[in-house]
Amino acid sequence: FDNYEFLVTDPDFWASLVNTLVLVGSVLVITVGLGTLLAVLYDQPFPGQGVARLLAIAPFFVMPTVSALVWKNLMMHPIYGVLGALSRGLGFEPVDWFAEYPMLSVILIVSWQWLPFALLILLTAVQSLDNEQKEAARMDGAGAVAQFFFITLPHLGRAISVVIMIETIFLLSVFAEIYVTTSGGPGLASTNLA
C-alpha cells in the first residue's frame, strides 16, 4: 500500500488529474456543442456543400504530432503565427499561447482534431431524422428553434452519447499534442495523467 499512499499524497498527481478532467470535459463540450450546430448547418442544402463537408472532416485525418506542430509553429507562434499576425494587424500585442495559456492551447488543438469525428456521427444522426416529423412540427407552427430543441436534439441523444463515450476513451490518453507543444509545462500547467 506504500505505492498508493505515495500516489495519493503526491501533489503532481492531483494537478495532473485536474488537468485531465479539464481537458476531457472542455473538449467534449466544444466538440459536442459545435458538432451539433455544424451537423444541423451541413444538413441544409447550400452551394459547395460537398467541398465544405470534405474540409470540415479533414482535420481528423491529420496525425496528432503533425497537428500539434502546425498549431505550435504556424498558428499560435507569437511572431510567425497566423494568430500573432492577426493580433498585430488589429493593433494588439501578440499572445504567446503556450506560455500564457498552455491548457487552453492544448484544448483548442485537441478540439480541432476531434470536432470532425463528432460532426460525422451527429450529421449522420441528423440525416436519419424523418422529414415528416419536421414537416408536422412546421405545420403545427413550430419555428426553427422549437424544432431544434424538441425534435432534432432529442433525436441526437444516442449519437451524442456515442460521441461522448468514444471521445472520452481516446481523450484520456492524449499525449502527443501536449508533449510536442508544452511538454506538460510551464510547470504542471498542462500535464495530464497520460
Model-identified regions with their sequence ranges:
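A structural signal for multi-pass alpha-helical bundles of membrane permease subunits
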Residues: 1-194
